[in-house]
Amino acid sequence: MLSQTSIPEVKEDVIGYALHQRRARVGQFQDLGPPDLITLIKSLPSSSSTTTATASANDNGATSNINGQDPTTIVTELHSHDKLKGQIGTFFYCMGIDTSDPTSITIFAKKITDLFLDTPQIWFGKKKHFHVSKISISSWNAFRKYDVNIIVHIPGTVQTYIINSDGEQSQLPSVAEASSGRNSQDLNVNMIWAETFMSGIVRDIMIMKDNRADGESQNLVETLIFNPFTSGELEDVANNFIKLFPLVYEKGVYLDAPTHVLNPSLTNNYLVETLVEIVRLTKSLEACRKMLKKLIEIHPEAVIILIRVYFACDLEIDAVDLINEQLNSPSSFLADDSKTSHIQLIFKSELLSIQSEFLLDVKRDYKLAKEVAMEAVNCAPNEFKTWYLLTRIYIKLNDMSNALLSLNACPMSQVKEKYVLRRIAPITSDENLHLPLPLDASIEEISSLNPMDVQLEQKSADPNLVNLSASSLKSTFQLAYKLLTEIVQITGWEQLLKYRSKIFVMEDEYQGSTSSIDEAEVRGNDISKMRSKRLCERWLDNLFMLLYEDLKTYTDWQSEQLYFDAQNSKYHKLTVEWELFGLCAKRLGHLPEAAKAFQIGLSQRFSPVCAKNLLQFYIDEHKRIRRDSVSANSELTSSQILSSINDIDSSIIDLVVKICCWNHRWYIEFSIILIDALSVAVQDMGITKVHNEIASRFSDPVAQLIDDNILNFLKNFTNDTFDN
């Protein structure tokens, strides 16, 4: 639903400011890089007679002389910092557009410029009939470390440049010129476009998947996010990604990997994560299987990716058969003596980790899972995930001593963070931010929510809640803390402390013991006990303190609520405080209590934090009921199960619609969480019934928004998986 009001813009003080800032920072871009940057040059009708003519003359001049000029001069002229009369420059970031070739980008650019042709724009409260004379789109090629800049003149030419990590600029020939083979450098043009497209899709998917636990949050308000799967201008995006995957397979390690992967490999990186997620979402199994089987002939280790795809598509038998074949067959790639033992051990640990995770989560064969996980640790002792899985298994086996020892042994990443969007062009003044309110689809409780009121509420919240340090944990520390909370749920705090004192010596105790030898001789028995203990890592000691803070907060909250309930009095808290209570309970694994807090918060006003966390709770409840319904020990009747499923589906639909409208309010038209959530209801009810249910509860524009952003994807981009 692209419209003038769906585009956030930042006004430039000087035309070309954003491009200049981006180019100055090209050498600092890392891994996946920044989102695409779109800049516009707009002119007002009062100066159209002169400005348009000048722009047209400049465009024609640039076209006619382009082969005879230095590319640096051309780019400088195209983005001059001289602010012409009647012209302004604006920019915004964008994700989800099709950057597979110049034609697709030009089509998208035309859609943007067409928005301003006939309809005046409400620009800071005044109607302005802008004409877009120039638009540029910059997209980071993460494989080659190039920034690809496409400049579209309205009307006129399309020009493309690349800026390498050293800031050097050069013109990129067109695809047609490359096909004619005018020089050897042109042969790379198609590859550059393929890499640029793949880089963009990886960013689009990973910004959602990497931040899923945080509700897919992103803090760049001047960012417009489309669904990449429905944005293909010339080809199906998912099929195109699968087709091009082999071309960049060997470069996947350059993109880095999720935070729990400390050492990216060919089969464990952001590129592979994206492929698996795309196949899971679009149900493109057959196309992917065909591609991977060909790739395996050249790169046998790619069988690990195929196994992951099988699990993602619920083909557990096929996946397990492949794992057993690779681990036990003499023809397996693991038996290839031509590969170094280190590389083989990495691949073997990945296979074993997949196998142990399956035994742990699906088969619940914890003893066998432990044997497999221990072998995975032996193969890759420097990887976090192998130790993480082993710790989880010890917890399931109720072996808390070994669980704590394994947790203490986890290799931690001090610097690695999730992929997040970073501002490349600083906003010089808040007054330059133009953030229109999309009016095409809105719900009163969402559109009427005043951000300033929410900020005041946050400032008024209980500091003890706001300052809970566990909420700011990142990377592997966040995952390790989750394991510690699982342990304390079983043992309780007092028993956990006993386990800690039994198996660990704390750092201050250790330092004290080594500084007094004479005293140690007197306390021989104590020293002997200390030597049988492990030194508790400082980071784990810190997690114990954070856990104590969370437990104290949770206990005080529950006690207060019980007191007020006993007095038949209402327990008054701000919505932001209910958010924080819910998040604290969720961290500690008290999910029903967390859900109750989120529900109370939503009853007071709309909160995206409460809504997204409550939605995830309903999805998990739906899975639990479905799983229990096929269990021989299920105590629910079929009618009770059906009633529970219907209630949950109804709640899911309600939350999905409201979150989708909230996202639309902030220029976000793509969410994997919402796609997954609504697909649960669609699986039960069918697309048509879900659409009718939404149409009966909400306005036509809101129903159309859900159709455009979610149901259209489920109907037309999932290979006929869902019934109408």
From Swiss-Prot:
Q: Where is this region: Disordered?
A: 51-71
Molecular function terms from GO: small GTPase binding
- One cellular component GO annotation, for this chain's record? exomer complex
Alphabetized, the UniProt keywords read: Golgi apparatus, Membrane, Protein transport, Transport
* Record membrane topology: Peripheral membrane protein
Which ranges are annotated Low complexity under compositional bias?
51-65
| Gene Ontology BP term (one) | chitin biosynthetic process
- In this chain, the stretch annotated as CHS5-binding covers 711-724
Location(s), subcellular: Golgi apparatus, trans-Golgi network membrane
Which residue ranges run through the membrane?
none
- Its primary localisation, in coarse terms, equals Golgi
The entry's family comment says: Belongs to the CHAPS family.
Q: What does this protein do?
A: Member of the CHS5-ARF1P-binding proteins (CHAPS) which mediates export of specific cargo proteins, including chitin synthase CHS3.
**Further details from the record:** Present with 3460 molecules/cell in log phase SD medium.
Q: Fill in the subunit field for this protein.
A: Component of the CHS5/6 complex composed of the 4 CHAPS proteins BCH1, BCH2, BUD7, and CHS6 as well as at least CHS5 and GTP-bound ARF1. The complex interacts with the cargo protein CHS3.
- Record-given protein name: Protein BCH1
Q: Which organism is it from?
A: Saccharomyces cerevisiae (strain ATCC 204508 / S288c) (Baker's yeast)
**By which gene is this protein encoded?**
BCH1
